[in-house]
């Protein structure tokens, strides 16, 4: 029997579902600070600010996880568009993403992917299709020791999530896809809320490895209604959570 506390929390979470959400407003790439795309400022500024982040429409979620918008959010629906700038980072370097205020009710995982840009293509002109199997996971945080990555851990880290680029990763241009999946309404599908932000980087160094096989996925394609962790009732008694997507590629 579900406790009164969990039932009350579920009601509150549903009420909050249409209220404030979040996005990455700043990030540090290999020691250099960048401002992310600011959806309530950048579209109304002339000249338009130059960013490394692909445009997002606002702080709201993508709930149709089988559409192109799940890739990098949708600037105006139908997917996002490339950004004009590219950040440079050495393999083995760190990227720290700072999120705007995140609701405590929006529990869930924090996941980061990289997408390899074809060598003959400029990332500032590249928009992956939904059939491009280029994305691989380099970091994830879910539910551990009673704490959720998207709320408890992120809050304890001053709204900042830091990932490391695998030191063996081959040089080239990549798209970084950093995402929170909020599960407060995910009892059934559709219900899970994806908040993806995408950034353009150039990786340098002497690495010579890239993942293959089951490490690679497409967006859309990586998540479906039956993917473990997409439909998940956080108001029941549970001890673990299956993070959606492929296994993390560590560079081996």
Curated annotation (Swiss-Prot):
Chain segments annotated as coiled-coil in the UniProt record: none
Residues that, per the record, bind O2: 184, 193
Disulfide bonds: 72-198
Signal peptide location: 1-20
GO biological process: cellulose catabolic process
GO cellular component: extracellular region
Biotechnological relevance of this protein: Lignocellulose is the most abundant polymeric composite on Earth and is a recalcitrant but promising renewable substrate for industrial biotechnology applications. Together with cellobiose dehydrogenases (CDHs) an enzymatic system capable of oxidative cellulose cleavage is formed, which increases the efficiency of cellulases and put LPMOs at focus of biofuel research.
Enzyme type, top EC level: oxidoreductase
Family per record: Belongs to the polysaccharide monooxygenase AA9 family.
Biological role stated in the UniProt entry: Lytic polysaccharide monooxygenase (LPMO) that depolymerizes crystalline and amorphous polysaccharides via the oxidation of scissile alpha- or beta-(1-4)-glycosidic bonds, yielding C1 or C4 oxidation products. Catalysis by LPMOs requires the reduction of the active-site copper from Cu(II) to Cu(I) by a reducing agent and H(2)O(2) or O(2) as a cosubstrate. The synergistic activity of LPMO9B with xylanase Xyl10G or cellulase Cel5B shows efficient bioconversion rates of 56 and 174 percent in pretreated kenaf (Hibiscus cannabinus) and oak, respectively.
Name listed for the protein in its UniProt record: AA9 family lytic polysaccharide monooxygenase B
């Amino acid at each position: 029997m579900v406790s009164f506390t969990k039932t009350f929390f579920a009601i509150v979470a549903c009420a909050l579902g249409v209220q404030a959400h979040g996005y990455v407003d700043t990030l540090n790439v290999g020691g250099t600070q960048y401002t992310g795309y600011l959806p309530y400022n950048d579209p109304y500024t002339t000249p338009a600010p130059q960013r490394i982040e692909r445009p997002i429409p606002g702080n709201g979620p993508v709930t149709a996880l089988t559409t192109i918008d799940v890739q990098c959010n949708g600037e105006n629906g139908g997917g996002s568009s490339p950004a004009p700038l590219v950040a440079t980072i050495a393999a083995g370097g760190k990227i720290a993403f700072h999120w705007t205020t995140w609701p405590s009710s929006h529990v869930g995982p924090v996941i980061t992917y990289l997408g390899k840009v074809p060598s003959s293509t400029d990332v500032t002109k590249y928009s992956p299709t939904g059939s491009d199997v280029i994305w691989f996971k380099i970091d994830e945080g879910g539910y551990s020791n009673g704490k959720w990555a998207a709320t408890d851990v992120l809050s304890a880290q001053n709204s900042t999530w830091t990932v490391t680029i695998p030191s063996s990763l081959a040089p080239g241009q990549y798209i970084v896809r950093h995402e929170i999946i909020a599960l407060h309404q995910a009892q059934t599908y559709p219900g899970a809320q994806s908040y993806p932000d995408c950034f353009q980087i150039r990786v340098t160094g002497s690495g010579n490895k890239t993942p293959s096989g089951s490490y690679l996925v497409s967006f859309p394609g990586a998540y479906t209604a039956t993917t473990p962790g997409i439909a998940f009732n956080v108001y029941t008694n549970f001890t673990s959570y299956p993070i959606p997507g492929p296994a993390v590629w560590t560079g081996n």
